[in-house]
């Protein structure tokens, strides 16, 4: 008997003993232990029956099929191809096709240890029915390998690896698709040592409720080369999911360049890492797009988990409560290279948020972070000892009702946001209560911004509102900004404010701050108990609005606050009833403001004030020269404008030369009342206007000291150079 006839007889006997019918020309293959079966091209098997297996290999058996093999099986719990014996091997040529119809069916599976199945190019596996698996490595030290252009379509699971130290390997341009609820397109479930790898151009699709594109259940690694695409659609769907385990196992997923991950549906996430100490790595040009309420682009919730992204990452999220980047595991970290973009649309959304102790999100240079929506926040740290860091040249934008660019909102003591040099931070916001573009609401938390920042805060509504570009509202909070800051506020009423006790805001040299189109504005405000403002040299503060303050240090019921300016400060207010510099504190310790050399104080409008100090122990100190100008000759400041006033035990002191020019009717150059004190080492005081007084006092004990070589002049009908009563010198 020839070998060919012998094999045909063996196969025929095997077929007759099985509980199914074979209708095709070619018989099923059931290779016995230690046998070798080889068939040529275009081999076709059609089977019907529950529990059927079209191609099987027992222990140490080897089966080889040529090109364009076709297997069709109709039946529940059936197998298209199965290694059911150890050390067995099944190999297909190019163009293999496997179609399974029935529930709990498996297209290809290694069921015995040390067994292997291999396909050439263009293999296709299609399964119809629930709880099915396209390719399953269900044994240890085993593998299933596909050449280029493999395609698997299933309802429940396209590929799974459940055996330890096993592999599933896909060549270039693989396409894997699932369509059922709770489906896993790629599933790595082994406890240790296993992997699933994809060459360039892999496409992973999953469409169903709670479906997952790539699921690492326990440990091991899934890796993709360049240009991978993952798309999931359905509520609670995840593009990539690394599940947390409590047995210490660690998982990893890696992508080459050009990966694109999409997740669409309620509570859908693009990348979701819960596994502790696990890693997700991405090359350059990664794109993550999610949509749906509560959706998140990148989420790392596992303690010690780590995400690494190359350059040019783009993350987009849309939907209420959506987030771009989220670090929620203690000690977790997410790092981006240069040119990252995060674009978020939705109410109560976040661009990037840290919500766990010691967690970090780090963006490289040239990052673009944009949020749009009511109560949206571009960058938010809401955990102690946590950090968001952004490199140079960042562009950060927040738009919408109460939208914020930077928010430090931590329960502990040392949350932090760091922004590099040359940043542009923009807010285009409406508000229904007090809103702040950059805010520290964390005890002892810190926001640091480098040199040459441009901050633009624009009110888009129509009502008068309260809102500051910079705000420290909690005790001990701090904002530190480098040299060359340019701050433009349009419609809101605050430039920078410190409300928290012991809080601090500091600027380097060359601060340029302006506020327009508002009233009751405060350029720089220090209101917290023992709070402190520090401003370097050459600062310019320009406020255009009535009832406003250029610099306001003090608040009712608080004291001990202070402000210090370097040399060449210029404070300008334009608007009726406004004050250029005002310090008021009434609880004993007083407030203190100090200016370096050659300060300029300018106030324009009716009933304006240049410098005003009030309250016991309150001091405004000009260390070397000051120029105070109220009104102009062509546009005078009438109706009781003042150059310098001290009241209620406060002191204004000028070392060097004080030049004070007052233009306006019924106005005053100097006034000290109610035990207030003004001390000028040398002065040139000129008051121009009807009923104007250069130096004015009353009977309540105010004191004015003007040193030698001073000049006091008054011009106008009823004008007086000096009107001194009790207490004046």
Which residues fall in each region the model found?
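Glycine-rich beta-solenoid repeat tracts in large extracellular/virion proteins
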Residues: 25-33, 53-59, 79-86, 106-113, ...
């Amino acid at each position: 008997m020839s070998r060919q006839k012998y094999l045909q007889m063996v196969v025929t006997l095997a077929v007759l003993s099985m509980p199914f019918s074979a209708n095709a020309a070619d018989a099923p293959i059931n290779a016995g232990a230690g046998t070798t079966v080889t068939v040529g091209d275009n081999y076709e098997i059609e089977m019907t029956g529950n529990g059927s297996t079209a191609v099987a290999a027992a222990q140490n058996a080897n089966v080889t099929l040529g090109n364009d093999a076709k297997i069709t099986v109709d039946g529940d719990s059936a197998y298209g191809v199965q290694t059911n014996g150890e050390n067995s091997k099944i190999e297909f040529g190019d163009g293999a096709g496997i179609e399974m119809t029935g529930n709990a069916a498996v297209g290809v599976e290694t069921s015995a240890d040390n067994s292997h199945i291999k396909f050439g190019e263009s293999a296709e596996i299609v399964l119809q029915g629930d709880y099915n698996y396209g390719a399953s490595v269900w044994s240890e030290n085993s593998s299933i390998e596909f050449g280029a252009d493999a395609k698997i379509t299933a309802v429940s699971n396209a590929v799974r690896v459940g055996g330890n130290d096993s592999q599933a390997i896909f060549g270039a341009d693989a396409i894997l698709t699932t369509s059922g609820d709770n489906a896993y397109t790629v599933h790595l479930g082994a406890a240790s040592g296993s992997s699933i790898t994809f060459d360039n151009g892999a496409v992973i699709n999953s469409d169903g409720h709670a479906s997952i594109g790539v699921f690492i259940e326990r440990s091991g690694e899934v890796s993709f080369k360049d240009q991978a695409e993952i798309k999931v659609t359905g509520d609670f769907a995840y593009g990539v999911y690394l599940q947390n385990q409590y047995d210490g196992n660690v998982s990893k997923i890696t992508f080459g360049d050009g990966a694109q991950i999409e997740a669409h549906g309620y509570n859908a996430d693009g990348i979701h890492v819960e596994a502790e100490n696990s890693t997700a790595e991405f090359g350059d040009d990664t794109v993550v797009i999610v949509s749906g309420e509560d959706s998140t682009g990148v989420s790392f919730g596992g303690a010690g988990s780590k995400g690494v992204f190359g350059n040019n990452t783009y993350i987009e999220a849309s939907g209420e409560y959506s987030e771009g980047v989220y670090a929620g595991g203690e000690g977790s970290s997410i790092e981006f290279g240069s040119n990252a973009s995060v674009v978020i649309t939705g109410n109560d959304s976040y661009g990037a948020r840290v919500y766990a102790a010691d967690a970090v999100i780090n963006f490289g240079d040239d990052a673009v972070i944009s949020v749009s929506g009511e109560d949206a926040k571009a960058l938010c740290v809401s955990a102690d000892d946590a950090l968001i860091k952004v490199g140079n040249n960042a562009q950060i934008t927040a738009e919408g009702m109460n939208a914020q660019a930077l928010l430090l909102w931590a329960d502990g003591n040392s949350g932090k946001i760091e922004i590099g040099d040359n940043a542009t931070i923009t807010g285009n916001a409406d508000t229904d209560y007090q809103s702040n573009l950059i805010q520290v609401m964390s005890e002892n938390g810190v926001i640091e911004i480098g040199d040459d920042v441009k901050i633009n805060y624009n009110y888009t509504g129509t009502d008068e509102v309260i809102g500051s570009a910079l705000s420290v509202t909690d005790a001990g909070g701090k904002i530190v900004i480098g040299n060359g800051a340019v701050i433009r506020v349009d419609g809101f009423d605050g430039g920078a404010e410190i409300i928290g006790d012991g809080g601090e805001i500091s600027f380097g040299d060359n601060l340029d701050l302006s506020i327009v189109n508002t009233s009751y504005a405060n350029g720089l405000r220090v209101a917290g108990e023992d709070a402190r403002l520090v401003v370097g040299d050459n600062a310019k503060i320009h406020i255009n609005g009535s009832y406003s303050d250029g610099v306001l240090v003090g608040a009712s019921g608080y004291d001990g606050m202070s402000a210090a300016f370097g040399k060449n400060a210029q404070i300008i207010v334009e608007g009726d009833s406004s004050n250029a510099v005002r310090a008021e504190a009434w609880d004993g310790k007083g407030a203190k403001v100090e200016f370096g050399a050659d300060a300029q104080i300018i106030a324009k409008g009716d009933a304006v004030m240049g410098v005003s100090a009030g309250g016991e122990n309150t001091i405004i100190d000009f260390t070397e020269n000051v120029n105070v100008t109220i009104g102009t000759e062509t546009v005078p400041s009438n109706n009781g404008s003042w150059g310098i006033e001290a009241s209620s035990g406060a002191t204004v002191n000028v070392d060097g030369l004080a030049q004070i020019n007052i233009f306006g009717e019924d106005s005053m150059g100097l006034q000290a009342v109610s035990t207030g004190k003004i001390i000028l080492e040398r002065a040139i005081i000129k008051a121009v206007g009807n009923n104007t007084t250069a130096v004015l006092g009353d009977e309540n004990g105010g004191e004015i000291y003007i040193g030698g070589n001073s000049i006091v002049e008054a011009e106008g009908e009823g004008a007086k150079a000096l009107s001194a009563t009790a207490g004046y010198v």
